[in-house]
């Protein structure tokens, strides 16, 4: 049984300009005191084509953690535009929040992110080289995808199997303007960015 349960993730200041920091308010509960730190990360998926474009925006150690409910605001700088392929700068991608204990990842919360120009002229005729100063970032806060992993909480043994679950308590916000694939609830423009068997929150 997991010793840590994530109760809620609230996306703050959304939508916002591309260069604005990411801010998430994370609430979690420990069923018993943890002797060591939890490591939280925010990861920006720069391209669906390769993990080499993933950017770890920030990581923070929280602990030792006493039993009970806890809440903190996790802020990370925007991704480095120079590390994002120009063809992937505008459109839909993913931001991930992960947490590990003893180096074992036990939860991953993924959000679709839509980067688009607000200026109608730029939207109609986008520049060849993306102008990140004109992009707005909109996180699909209402539809997080939550993946939980069985881990060994007492030592550093290998992580056990992963399970995909839905958690209706996580997230609320504005939807993206992206056409879903019928029956899947997945934006048609980005199949495969998140696991096919992960579940939408209702």
Curated annotation (Swiss-Prot):
Changing residue 36 to A: Abolishes CDAN1 interaction. Interacts with histone H3 (via C-terminus), including histone H3.1, H3.2 and H3.3, and histone H4; the interaction with H3 is direct. Interacts with the CHAF1A, CHAF1B and RBBP4 subunits of the CAF-1 complex. Interacts with HAT1, NASP and TAF1. Found in a soluble complex with NASP and histones H3 and H4; the interaction with NASP is probably indirect and mediated by H3-H4. Interacts with CDAN1. Found in a cytosolic complex with IPO4 and histones H3 and H4. Interacts with CREBBP. Signal peptide: none annotated. It holds the Pfam family ASF1_hist_chap. It comes from Homo sapiens (Human). It comes from the Eukaryota. This is Histone chaperone ASF1B. Residues 1-156 are annotated as: Interaction with histone H3. Highly expressed in testis and at lower levels in colon, small intestine and thymus. Phosphorylated by TLK1 and TLK2. One of its GO terms (biological process) is blastocyst hatching. Keywords: Chaperone, Chromatin regulator, Cytoplasm, Developmental protein, Differentiation, Nucleus, Phosphoprotein, Spermatogenesis, Transcription, Transcription regulation. Changing residue 198 to A: Reduced phosphorylation of ASF1B by TLK2. Histone chaperone that facilitates histone deposition and histone exchange and removal during nucleosome assembly and disassembly. Cooperates with chromatin assembly factor 1 (CAF-1) to promote replication-dependent chromatin assembly. Also involved in the nuclear import of the histone H3-H4 dimer together with importin-4 (IPO4): specifically recognizes and binds newly synthesized histones with the monomethylation of H3 'Lys-9' (H3K9me1) and diacetylation at 'Lys-5' and 'Lys-12' of H4 (H4K5K12ac) marks in the cytosol. Its main location: nucleus. The keyword Transcription regulation applies. The modification Phosphoserine is found at residue 198. GO terms for cellular component: chromatin; cytosol; nucleoplasm; nucleus; protein-containing complex. Gene3D superfamilies: Histone chaperone ASF1-like. SUPFAM superfamilies: ASF1-like. It is found in: Nucleus; Cytoplasm, Cytosol. One of its GO terms (molecular function) is histone chaperone activity. Residues 1-155 are annotated as: Interaction with CHAF1B. Belongs to the ASF1 family.
